[in-house]
C-alpha cells in the first residue's frame, strides 16, 4: 500500500480529516500488506502514550511514533482477539480487548464516535488463507 491508497481508504471510511496528519501513518503504509484491507483507525492512550490502533481484515496494529526516540509496533492477528469492549462516553471513551493467549490491551481517551466503525471492522470476515 502506498500513501495515496491509504489516504483514499481513510476517505472511504470517512476518517481522513481526523488522521491525515498523524505521523503513525508513515509506518502504517509500510505495514499493510498486499491485498490487506484497512477497516478502522483510532487513537488512544495505551501504556501511558498516545498510540494509533489500525484494524485490518487480518490484524490489529498498534503504532507508537515517538518524536525523540524509537517507536514501537505491536501486531495482533484478528483471530487471536477473544473479546473486546468499547465503552462510549461523552468524553474519555475506552476500548479494551484481550487475546486467546491472555494478553490484555486498553486504550483510554479514544474517539467514542468511532465505536460503530471499530465494531464493524471486528465483525468483518477473516480472509481465506490458501
Task: Say what each PLM segment does.
Residues 2-33, 43-48, 66-130:
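Acidic, Ser/Thr- and proline-rich intrinsically disordered linker/docking segments
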Residues 8, 40, 60-61:
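General secondary-structure edge motif
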Residues 48-63:
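Polybasic phosphoinositide-binding surfaces of eukaryotic membrane-targeting domains
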